[in-house]
Swiss-Prot record:
It catalyses: uridine + ATP = UMP + ADP + H(+); cytidine + ATP = CMP + ADP + H(+). One of its GO terms (molecular function) is cytidine kinase activity. It comes from Anoxybacillus flavithermus (strain DSM 21510 / WK1). GO terms for cellular component: cytoplasm. HAMAP family: Uridine_kinase. This is Uridine kinase. Its EC number is 2.7.1.48. Gene3D superfamilies: P-loop containing nucleotide triphosphate hydrolases. Signal peptide: none annotated. Belongs to the uridine kinase family. Pfam families: PRK.
Length: 211
């Protein structure tokens, strides 16, 4: 009988290095059966709201995410069933009509700022990871990313950080660190921690007779 896939949850604040960590794990197991599932794709559909209301969306609050759909999709993947992953349109601030077909794999990496906040999600994880990076490093990374990649102004990024990102991080994201099995300081630059994670994943896969 085929064992269930391994689920790794990777959480941490915006700009902490979550994506760098998940990519490092993904690249290590490239050639094996592995997929990345980003929580950002699972923001709630807001097509029923006027555009002006959508502009007020707080993307750093737990209620912004459609965790019910995410959990449903993880259950399907655990049963080796394909899913149609939603696509979020940040220009319209709602879910796109497009979907991405995702085939089941033996390793599922679930990455997002609040993947450890929902107990139902945590209960599906074999390994829970929190990427812990100093606030000044996180804001610098966010500034560079949003200005360069998203065409934001310096003033708008700082205003959002002060009024939304920082308070939401302190209220909802940082407290989820206590649920982590592994805390990775310095994000993706902590090669020792990443190597330990890879070793743990390999052990679970071997126990599941997948490797």
């Amino acid at each position: 009988m085929r064992k269930k896939p391994v689920v790794i949850g990777v959480a941490g604040g915006s700009g902490s290095g979550k994506t760098t960590v998940t990519k490092a794990i993904y690249e290590h197991f490239q050639g094996h059966s592995i997929l990345m599932l980003e929580q950002d794709f699972y923001y709630k559909d807001q097509s029923h709201l006027p555009f002006e209301e959508r502009l007020k969306t707080n993307y750093d609050h737990p209620l912004a995410f459609d965790n019910d759909l995410l959990i449903e999709h993880i259950h399907k993947l655990l049963n080796y069933e394909p899913i149609d992953k939603p696509v979020y349109d940040y220009t319209l601030h709602t879910r796109s009509n497009e979907v991405i077909r995702v085939e089941p794999k033996d390793v599922i990496i679930l990455e997002g700022i609040l993947v450890l906040e929902d107990e139902r999600l945590r209960n599906l994880m074999d390994i829970k990871v929190y990427v812990d990076t100093d606030a000044d490093i996180r804001i610098i990374r966010r500034l560079l990313r949003d200005i360069k990649e998203r065409g934001r102004t310096l003033e708008s990024v700082i205003e959002q950080y002060v009024n939304v990102v920082r308070p939401m991080h302190n209220q909802f994201i940082e407290p989820t660190k206590r649920y982590a099995d592994i805390i990775i300081p310095e994000g993706g630059h902590n090669h020792v921690a990443i190597d330990l994670m890879v070793t743990k994943i390999q052990t679970i896969l071997e126990q599941n007779s997948i490797l």
